Amino acid sequence: MTKVETRLEILDVTLRDGEQTRGVSFSTSEKLNIAKFLLQKLNVDRVEIASARVSKGELETVQKIMEWAATEQLTERIEILGFVDGNKTVDWIKDSGAKVLNLLTKGSLHHLEKQLGKTPKEFFTDVSFVIEYAIKSGLKINVYLEDWSNGFRNSPDYVKSLVEHLSKEHIERIFLPDTLGVLSPEETFQGVDSLIQKYPDIHFEFHGHNDYDLSVANSLQAIRAGVKGLHASINGLGERAGNTPLEALVTTIHDKSNSKTNINEIAITEASRLVEVFSGKRISANRPIVGEDVFTQTAGVHADGDKKGNLYANPILPERFGRKRSYALGKLAGKASISENVKQLGMVLSEVVLQKVLERVIELGDQNKLVTPEDLPFIIADVSGRTGEKVLTIKSCNIHSGIGIRPHAQIELEYQGKIHKEISEGDGGYDAFMNALTKITNRLGISIPKLIDYEVRIPPGGKTDALVETRITWNKSLDLEEDQTFKTMGVHPDQTVAAVHATEKMLNQILQPWQI
């Protein structure tokens, strides 16, 4: 018998629960831009963007987002977390222009008694008052059962009575949160299944937390039990270990269940980068789906297998997410790794040169030196007996910055046998350097790629004289939707000088007519 494919709703909680990540606070414009991207490009079904009554600034932010949403007919896809506090939350939401209240109720007897000091009967009366007032105010209501995961395990009768009470109210959905991230997949199935068996007509959704790194697995079991929606955040932002990561959740749903979502997979990477930049929380290189290294093969045997029929490919293809497969260079590289990188550079090597390049790459890897695809032309020139000299050399760079002075830079570079000098100011030392450099390159008709990312890596240990590694990502395409990115790296005890070295490498990369 063929199973019927179900379509699940996804509520993105990046802007509300995700903002509870330590050190994360989105500005109004950042929240607006993220909300636009989530709803219009990533195509999440709904977004939760704020908690009611947090601050005047938060009210103004919600008002801005709702003004935009009204012009796009998206107001009912935007939701606000609210509280059982009489008419206060509802009035706040009315003032904000929002149309949907996600009411936070107590999903365990322990929370109810210890935090509120009320009986279930008293609390249910309070909940009903808020719901009735919200409906009269023209709002739609969903209900969170906070700490439900502990509630159904330790006070099941209370949970049953609360859901029974809510089943008689005019609400849209009931949310089942694993607030403290304590559930196993088996427990998730049991808890969700027990409610859906008794209340099959209620729209239940599961809200996971990742304390045991089980939130995606728990979500799969919630699907198996029959939930109609799931909650997630971009990059897994959230309290403690975070919420269920949307990128991994959606991919797993599409590949490992009989369900689908409305999510546009190819926009996942861009959503991840957007939130990474605005949150200031870098994602790890090996984070599934969106990490920098997850579509990179390091072992030479893998590159060889891919070349001979994609022997090491899996269903998580990079093209699904707007990305490309790459092959790392180092002591584990093989000829296939080298040839694939050379091919991407638009070059063809003889077997003799290819072998020499491989030997040099392995030698550098043994010395614990990072080799990037952008280094290959220089290595090829060297092993081929060519000079591999720089086309452009930064002869000197004096950068001054400090407290009470405007940063400024004076640079001197040599290009095609001529010396070029320039002075400029900037918002920082490197910005002043780039402003001076741009004046020169504009005169020379050289177009500088757009700087996409600037990353500084300092080794642990706290030594003030430690070598700093600065990696800069550039995009050669004026159309940022087109991926022509490449990285250059500089190493120096001074962070800004390391960035200058990385920039010099970038200039030689775009100016060198490599033809080996």
Swiss-Prot record:
Residues of the signal peptide: none
Outcome after substituting residue 17 to N: 4.4-fold increase in Km for pyruvate and 480-fold decrease in kcat
SUPFAM superfamilies: 2-isopropylmalate synthase LeuA, allosteric (dimerisation) domain (SSF110921), Aldolase (SSF51569)
Cofactor: Mn(2+)
Pyruvate carboxyltransferase domain residues: 8-269
Catalytic activity: pyruvate + acetyl-CoA + H2O = (3R)-citramalate + CoA + H(+)
Cross-referenced InterPro entries: 2-IPM_HCS-like, 2-isopropylmalate_synth_dimer, AIPM/Hcit_synth_CS, Aldolase_TIM, CitmalSynth_CimA, LeuA/HCS_post-cat, LeuA_allosteric_dom_sf, PYR_CT
Summary of activators and inhibitors of this protein: Regulated by the end-product isoleucine via a feedback inhibition. The binding of isoleucine has inhibitory effects on the binding of both pyruvate and acetyl-CoA. May act via conformational change of the dimer interface of the regulatory domain, leading to inhibition of the catalytic reaction.
Effect recorded for residue 144 to V: 114-fold increase in Km for pyruvate and 5.3-fold decrease in kcat
Entry similarity comment: Belongs to the alpha-IPM synthase/homocitrate synthase family.
Record-given protein name: (R)-citramalate synthase CimA
Source species taxonomy: Bacteria, Pseudomonadati, Spirochaetota, Spirochaetia, Leptospirales
